[in-house]
Amino acid sequence: RQMCIRDSFPPIGKATFGTLSDAGDPETGHCRNFEKHIFGTHIAEVEVDTELGTVDVLRYVAVHDCGQVINPMLLTGQIEGGISMGLGQALFEDMKEDPETGRLINNSFTDYLLPTSMDMPLEMKVDFLQTPDEDGPFGALGIGEATPCPVLPAIANAVYNAIGVQIRELPLTPQRVLEYLHKACLLYTSDA
């Protein structure tokens, strides 16, 4: 039996979307703030040590459509910075709080781990498409907030592809990877 998923859940909300009518000043490029959607895709290749639970990102590719690119070097740096930020969220950064007081337990750089240059992929390729945006200044679109978002699923799915176990909690710490591998091994051996 086939059924549309949309029909199996009652609606829980409604959304509306409006577009901008102000195209901006053609000489200066100035225009009002507005919402825009940008598109990109990221691919990660990882190596997972199944004895230690460590995840190393070996290669990484990111491609974004940023409208008209004004400064390619700055744009590349912005995307690489977003990859670094997302890599930290995917593999290391974990806010821990005291359950009684609600205060952060790991509130220093000693306890709250961030990626270093040693954690970054050895091979990283950044590219962009250029579809000029009619509303953006000189046809450009923003990129800053969008670059870390695809990093987390790219790394998590690469880990899934590498070990065959889907981990739906972040960060992918060695302890968490080993815990999920152990659970999967127990499930596999009990089914056999």
Label each residue range with its predicted role.
Residues 2, 6-190:
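C-terminal catalytic domains of large/alpha subunits in multi-subunit enzymes
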